[in-house]
Amino acid sequence: MPNVNTLLAARGTTFTNNFASYPLCCPSRAPFSTGQYGHNHTIMGNAPPTGGYDKLAPTHSNTLPAWLRTAGYHTVHVGKYLNGYGRARPTEIPAGWAEWYGATDPSTYNFYNYRLNENGRLVTYGTGAANYQTDVYGRKAVELIRRHAPSAQPLFLSVEFVAPHSAGP
């Protein structure tokens, strides 16, 4: 942990009293979208029938991005969403998002040669160094912030990296 403290904590924010509500990806992400604990949102796994994108999909109109967009926010998502997103309907954009740059399965966990749904258009990124997934997400987020900065409209930007899931390159 010394490198983490030196490189991140000393230059940013630390959370000393935080916890994950569930030790799996989808059940841990669902509370952020729904505002509910696991026993209420019923997402208990990463794949059907207990979890994943299709399990949460029927509730998308009643999630944080939908609430914020209704309240006047410009809502943008960049990166990973939920396991299974994009497998059956790769150009679908969940309710509530004004802009969407979502990683689509089965390439979500690829750091190169992956595909994003960019506002309903599928874009494939290749193997060049400039296509490293974490860097692409970061550049998109910075560009979105810069583009939106002059606006008086509040911005909600969700940037969800894949690398922490698998200690990627």
Which residues are covered by each model-predicted region?
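Formylglycine-dependent sulfatase
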Residues: 1-169
